[in-house]
């Protein structure tokens, strides 16, 4: 046990990003309520980052925006997509964190030098294999590895892997592949009836899955940052 009362450590979490395309409070509230109703177990009280890049030209009351989103059933972690200094001041005044998205560009010489000193951080681990049914309320995570389930996955269960996910049975729960952001990850399933499928943060709720593939043996992947699905057999 540590001798210090608290420890502050870095970690990684997968968060959903709520992209706002309309600044109307009434529209936002109704849209969030409708979305949560589609998958309440997954989305109710879920932490989200609000991206305001699409409505950057509008005047936003961030205190009111936070209240609207949280009253609708989500929990606001921070704001992203803001590039205007005055708007950022308004976000800070609303006591909301500003989260920056994107990559840091390094000078070529520094980048080349970094490559010579690269050390793998996330070493792929041995595949995690589950032989028993996954029941409602269960949550299985395979960090830095693939996840294989050799049985059925009930509604309300959740499978998460940093790599690929294979389900050799009926999938009625939720599955998230590429949880750490690996866009090359796939989902393979012999009978798709999922509440939610997600790869590297891109997801479909049950009503967004093309009906032609429901109940079928399928694989899902990302193409140009969009989910795609095709039959396995």
Swiss-Prot record:
The record's keywords, sorted A to Z, are: Cell cycle, Cell division, Septation
Q: Which cysteine-cysteine pairs are annotated as disulfide bonds in the entry? A: none
GO terms under biological process: cell morphogenesis; division septum assembly; regulation of cell division; regulation of cell septum assembly
NCBIfam families, sorted = minC (TIGR01222)
Sum up the protein's function in the record's words.
Cell division inhibitor that blocks the formation of polar Z ring septums. Rapidly oscillates between the poles of the cell to destabilize FtsZ filaments that have formed before they mature into polar Z rings. Prevents FtsZ polymerization.
> What does the sequence similarity comment in the record state about its family?
Belongs to the MinC family.
UniProt-recorded name of the protein: Probable septum site-determining protein MinC
Q: From what organism does this protein derive?
A: Proteus mirabilis (strain HI4320)
């Amino acid at each position: 046990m540590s001798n210090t009362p608290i420890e502050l450590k870095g970690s990684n979490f997968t968060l959903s990003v709520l992209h706002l395309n309309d600044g109307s409070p009434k529209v936002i509230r109704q849209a969030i309520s409708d979305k949560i109703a589609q998958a309440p177990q997954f989305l109710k009280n879920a932490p989200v980052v609000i991206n305001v890049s699409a409505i950057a030209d509008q005047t936003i009351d961030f205190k009111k925006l936070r209240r609207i989103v949280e009253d609708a059933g989500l929990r606001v972690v921070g704001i992203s997509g803001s590039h205007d200094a005055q708007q950022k001041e308004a976000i800070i005044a609303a006591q909301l964190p500003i989260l920056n998205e994107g990559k840091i560009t390094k000078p070529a010489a520094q980048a080349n030098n970094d490559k010579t000193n690269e050390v793998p951080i996330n070493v792929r681990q041995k595949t995690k294999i589950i032989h028993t049914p996954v029941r409602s309320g269960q949550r299985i995570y395979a960090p830095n590895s693939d996840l294989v389930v050799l049985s059925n996955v009930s509604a309300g269960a959740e499978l998460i892997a940093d790599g690929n996910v294979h389900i050799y049975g009926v999938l009625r729960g939720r599955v998230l592949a590429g949880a750490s952001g690996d866009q090359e990850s796939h989902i393979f399933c012999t009978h798709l009836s999922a509440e939610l499928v997600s790869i590297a943060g891109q997801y479909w709720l049950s009503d967004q899955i093309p009906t032609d593939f429901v109940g079928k043996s399928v694989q899902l992947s990302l193409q140009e940052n969009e989910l795609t699905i095709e039959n396995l057999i």
